[in-house]
A protein has these predicted regions:
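Active-site rim helix/loop that mediates acceptor-substrate recognition in acyltransferases
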Residues: 1-13, 17, 26, 32
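Glycine-rich acetyl-CoA-binding "A-motif" of GNAT/NAT acetyltransferases
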Residues: 20-23, 95
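Conserved acyl-donor/pantetheine-binding loop and adjacent beta-alpha core of acyl/acetyltransferases
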Residues: 24-53
Length: 126
């Protein structure tokens, strides 16, 4: 659960405008468990961060907030020595998929998870 993710070093960023939560993003350290999902050889899965749930307030859609959060997410991962980032996106979620691609991620596969079908995106950080 959430506490378990925080206990292993996960973080949640929530951005506000005044008292209104505008957007949020979650970092989950991937670890060796991600090997089964990603199936990419030759990378250190302990140096990979997973983009967890992302939220953008409906009233703030279309302002580039997700893309800005993804950039900050990458900066954070680089600052703690991580080399890779991955995430999963529902195939019907065109907006998130476009933001992942805009942020330099590539769709590497598609799998069925507990929450249903997901596209898997991955990139190596600079």
């Amino acid at each position: 659960g959430l506490q378990g993710m925080l206990d292993i070093g996960g973080k949640i960023w929530i951005y506000y405008e005044g008292d209104i939560p505008v957007c949020s993003i979650m970092f989950i350290p991937s670890g060796e468990d991600a090997k089964n999902d990603l199936e990419i050889e030759g990378i250190d899965y302990n140096l990979m961060g997973d983009i967890g749930p992302v939220f953008v307030n409906f009233d703030y859609l279309g302002h580039g907030l997700m893309y800005q959060m993804l950039q900050k997410f990458d900066e954070y991962l680089e600052s703690i020595g991580y080399k890779y980032v991955m995430t999963t996106v529902h195939p019907d979620n065109i907006f998130s998929s476009r933001n992942m691609v805009k942020n330099g991620m590539k769709k590497v596969s598609q799998k069925v998870f507990k929450r249903g079908l997901r596209d898997i995106y991955f990139k190596e950080l600079d």
